Amino acid sequence: MEDLYGILGVDHNASVDEIRRAYRRLARELHPDINPDSADRFKAVTHAYNILSDPEQRQRYDRHVSGGFSSDFNLSDLFQSFFDTSAEFQRGSDLLVNIDIDLKTAIYGGSQVVKIDSLVVCDVCNGTRSEPGYKAEVCFDCNGSGVVRGEVRTTLGNLITQNTCSKCRGNGERIDHPCRRCYGNGSRSAPRDITINIPPGVETGMRIKIPNMGNAGGAMPGDLYVDCKVKEHPYFLRDGQDLYCRLDISLVDALLGTKVKIDSLDGELAVVIPALSQNRDVIRIANKGAVTLRGGKGDLCIVLNVLLMQKLDPEHRALLKKIMPNPPKPKLAKRTSGFFSWLKNKFT
């Protein structure tokens, strides 16, 4: 077990004021908004301060360290009593932002920069809440602990209550000369550019969590949540793992077959159109579809749309009758459902 006094760099007989000054110095140095790599150290410093600045909890800790507790004493209860009452004060609030993502980025991943307004550590007072040249004093109401304890009589006995100090709002300090930039809050609203890393396979309705990029708080910042909406693409449609597109071809190419190049989301792609292709035939190209979050990849489904000639001159009409002297007569066809009905709804 690490020594709480050692974490703050103070002696075991340090006064509350010395503990507070040591904490404020370390908090300015290790705050995640200023030094993101020191988040764990900052959390440890904050935990140590909140226990040692509370006379009752400090006494319990000192007794345990000196061996004054029975063997069934659990030190984690001491820490838990702190976490349960002040975790909300320790952490900044979360933020939520909505972004529109193009289909290619949603399928293959990428990054996107968004602008947000969030609370950041004040750049004038560095979170101390006091004007430069001044320092905070210990709050008289809570003696610097940030919490006020009381006793309530009940039929079951006396209950000890613990509430956030209303005078210092849980900070344990009295600010006589509040910072003019942040009005004594220690943080202020400011615009920020945040780069969102989008994993492959994102779909509309999915939420991305970015830890410690929310509002600044008394200790750790909150998290940033990003709600994703995938924009419609003018040519491609995603359905599960598969991508669909429609390819217009001439009657000649449908009858004789051909080879064409199309610009897919994955780059230029050569497509072979078989001879005697029918309208709404589907050419399926494996592993050229959408990527999923679990790493699978679907197919690219190319739906053929055969374009008939809008006009026939007498020469072409005579030629067609010569090629097909006995075409099949029109007749009713059985109604179909399922796949082709779905295609009709999607592409007509």
Curated annotation (Swiss-Prot):
Cofactor binding notes: Binds 2 Zn(2+) ions per monomer.
Cofactors that this protein relies on: Zn(2+)
Binding site for Zn(2+) 1: C122, C125, C179, C182
CXXCXGXG motif-type repeats, residues: 122-129, 139-146, 165-172, 179-186
Keywords, in A-Z order: Chaperone, Cytoplasm, DNA replication, Metal-binding, Repeat, Stress response, Zinc, Zinc-finger
Biological process (GO), any one: response to heat
Record has Zinc as a keyword: yes
Residues that coordinate or bind Zn(2+) 2: C139, C142, C165, C168
Gene3D superfamilies: DnaJ domain, Heat shock protein DnaJ, cysteine-rich domain, Urease metallochaperone UreE, N-terminal domain
GO function term, MF aspect, one: zinc ion binding
Subcellular location: Cytoplasm
Pfam families assigned to the protein according to its UniProt record, in alphabetical order: DnaJ (PF00226), DnaJ_C (PF01556), DnaJ_CXXCXGXG (PF00684)
Entries under InterPro entries matching the protein: DnaJ, DnaJ_C, DnaJ_domain, DnaJ_domain_CS, HSP40/DnaJ_pept-bd, HSP_DnaJ_Cys-rich_dom, HSP_DnaJ_Cys-rich_dom_sf, J_dom_sf
Zinc finger (CR-type): 109-191
CC per GO annotation: cytoplasm
Domain of life: Bacteria
Functional summary from the UniProt entry: Participates actively in the response to hyperosmotic and heat shock by preventing the aggregation of stress-denatured proteins and by disaggregating proteins, also in an autonomous, DnaK-independent fashion. Unfolded proteins bind initially to DnaJ; upon interaction with the DnaJ-bound protein, DnaK hydrolyzes its bound ATP, resulting in the formation of a stable complex. GrpE releases ADP from DnaK; ATP binding to DnaK triggers the release of the substrate protein, thus completing the reaction cycle.
Subunit structure: Homodimer.
Protein family: Belongs to the DnaJ family.
Name this polypeptide is given: Chaperone protein DnaJ
Organism: Tropheryma whipplei (strain Twist) (Whipple's bacillus)
